[in-house]
Amino acid sequence: MMDSLRTAANSLVLKIIFGIIIVSFILTGVSGYLIGGGNNYAAKVNDQEISRGQFENAFNSERNRMQQQLGDQYSELAANEGYMKTLRQQVLNRLIDEALLDQYARELKLGISDEQVKQAIFATPAFQVDGKFDNSRYNGILNQMGMTADQYAQALRNQLTTQQLINGVAGTDFMLKGETDELAALVAQQRVVREATIDVNALAAKQPVTEQEIASYYEQNKNNFMTPEQFRVSYIKLDAATMQQPVSDADIQSYYDQHQDQFTQPQRTRYSIIQTKTEDEAKAVLDELNKGGDFAALAKEKSADIISARNGGDMGWLEDATIPDELKNAGLKEKGQLSGVIKSSVGFLIVRLDDIQPAKVKSLDEVRDDIAAKVKHEKALDAYYALQQKVSDAASNDTESLAGAEQAAGVKATQTGWFSKDNLPEELNFKPVADAIFNGGLVGENGAPGINSDIITVDGDRAFVLRISEHKPEAVKPLADVQEQVKALVQHNKAEQQAKVDAEKLLVDLKAGKGAEAMQAAGLKFGEPKTLSRSGRDPISQAAFALPLPAKDKPSYGMATDMQGNVVLLALDEVKQGSMPEDQKKAMVQGITQNNAQIVFEALMSNLRKEAKIKIGDALEQQ
C-alpha cells in the first residue's frame, strides 16, 4: 500500500477503530473481502468465494434491520418459513451481485485514491457527534473489534470502487437540448375541450325491468349478495395496568441494594498519546516533554497516529473495557503523569494520563422515583401473571362456559353484539384475538356455542379468554331481501348500454357535420370550453389526449366514460403547446435519465450473471 495507508495501518487508534466499521459493511456484503472462503462457501462467483460466515452475517444484519423497521409485525414474517427462505435467497443474490460488480470494476481497472479512503473514514457517521468527527466516540466503539487497518482499508477501497462503477453506469445516459425542449412541450401540452354528458342515472330510471331479468341477474351474481360470517363473543380481559400494587420504602431499599450495578457509573480514564515509528523518535519526543515541551503541540507535529494527532493526542474518555492494553500497562496513576517509551504493535508510544473519573454509585434519593416505578410495574406483572394462570386453569377445567373463569378473575364476562371480520369490536382488535375468533376452532356446530379459548396474550401485559356464544355462517341473501337492489343494478346496466349506443350514433353524426340537429334531438348540448392538462389522470383527460388533432375550424370528436359512469361526448377544439419552467424541466430530465440508467444497470447485471460461473454451496442448496 502507499505511504498514507501504511500510516493508517500503523495507527494505534485505527488499529482499534477498523474492526467495528466492518459491521456496517456487512449490510452490503463488503465483509466478503475480509472473511476467508474455505471449502464451506455459500456461493462461488467465478473464482471468488462468498463464505458461509459472510452470508450468515449479511442475513442476520438484514433480519435485524427488518425487525427494527417493522417492530411487532416482524414476528409474523419470521414465523413464515417460505418468506424467510425467500429473504435468504434475496440476501445471497445481493452478495453475488456485489461480487460480480467488484470483479468487473477490477477488470476495468477502476481505482480509489488513498486520500479518498482517508476522507471516507473521517466521514463515517458512526464516529461523529453532532455531525463532526469525535475522537472519544471513535475510540470507544472501535476498541471492541479485532480487524486490522490493512483489512479495513482494503474493504473500504473495494466498496468505494464498486460505487464508482455504479455511478459511472448511472451517469452515462443524457438527453440533448432539442430532445428536452420537444419532450417538455409535449408533456406541458394543454387541450381545450367541450363536453356533453349523457346522464346514466337519469336513463336508468326509465328502463323497464322484468321479473325474469331480476331473477337471472340474481342467479348469475349471487356472490355479490352475501351476508358475511357473523359472531357474538363473550370475553374476559386481564390487564396488568389495572393491577397496580402499593410500593413501600422497604421495597425500594431492597431493589436498590440488590441492583447496585444499575446505578453505578464505571470509572472513566482520559489519555493523550504521541505515537512514533521508531524508538529513537519516541525518546527524542520524551526528552522534549521532560524539558517542558507542550504535549498537544508535539502530538500534532510528530505523532504518527493520524486521528489523535488532530486533537493534540487526546483519545477522549475511555471506560476500562475499551482501554488498549498498552495504556493499561503503562502504570500511570496521577493526573499529568507521563509514561516512558512504550513498545507496541503499532510502533512506539508516549502516554500521558490526563484525568480520572472514579466509579460513582447514584444515591437512593437520585433514583428513588425510577425504582418505585420499576417495582410497581414488576409487582403488577407478578399479580397479572398469577391471575392469568388462575383464569387459564379455570377456563380449561370448564370449557362449556366462562363461569369458572369469571369467578377466578373476579369480573363478569363482556358480551359483544354481532360482528364480522370487517367490524371487529375495537376492544378485541388485536391480531392474536382476531385469529382465535376467525380461525374456526372455537365455533360450535350449527351455530351452537363452542369451547373456551386458551389464554390469548397481547403485548405481554394484557390477556383475553373468550368463547363464541353465537355464530352465523356466510350465506347468500334471499332474493326477496335484495330484489330492489338487483332491480336497480339491472336498470343501471341497461342504461349504460343504451347511453353507449346513443353516443356512438351521435358521434357518427358529429363527425359527418350533422351534429347540431342530432344533439338537439337528443336533448344534449356541449358545455363551455375547459382546458385540460396531460397530467390529468381522470378518464376525460385521458380520452382528450388520445384524440387526433383538430383540423382548422373543425373540432375532433370522441367519447369517454367519466368517474360516475356517465357517457361523455368530447369536442376537441384546440391544442395549446406548453412550456415548462427550467427547474421542472431539469427534474423531468433527471427522472428520465435515472430510469434509463436503471435499465442499463439491470442489463449490465443480467449480462454479468449470464457470463459468470456461479455455484451455490451445497449447504445452501439443501436449505
UniProtKB/Swiss-Prot annotation:
Keyword field contains Transmembrane: yes
Single GO term (MF): identical protein binding
Pfam families: Rotamase_2, SurA_N_3
Cellular component aspect of the GO annotation: plasma membrane
Effect recorded for G312 to A/R: Cannot complement a surA null mutant or reduce the htrA-lacZ activity induced by periplasmic stresses
Residue spans, topological domain Cytoplasmic: 1-15
Broad class of the protein's primary localization: membrane
Cellular compartment(s): Cell inner membrane
Swiss-Prot/TrEMBL keywords: Cell inner membrane, Cell membrane, Chaperone, Membrane, Stress response, Transmembrane, Transmembrane helix
NCBIfam families documented for this protein: PRK10788.1
Entry text on domains: Consists of an N-terminal helix that anchors PpiD in the inner membrane, followed by three domains that face the periplasm. The first or the third domain are probably chaperone domains. The second domain is a parvulin-like domain, which is devoid of catalytic activity. It shows a parvulin fold and resembles most closely the inactive first parvulin domain of SurA, which is part of the chaperone unit of this protein and presumably involved in substrate recognition.
Family the UniProt entry places it in: Belongs to the PpiD chaperone family.
Stated role: Chaperone that functions as a gatekeeper on the periplasmic side of the SecYEG translocon. Facilitates the translocation of precursor proteins across SecYEG by interacting with the translocating substrate. Also plays a role in the release of newly synthesized secreted proteins at the periplasmic exit site of the Sec translocon. May be involved in the early periplasmic folding of many newly translocated proteins. Acts as a transient subunit of the Sec translocon that binds to the lateral gate of SecY and is detached by nascent membrane proteins but not by SecA.
Protein's recorded name: Periplasmic chaperone PpiD
Source organism of this protein record: Escherichia coli (strain K12)
Gene: ppiD
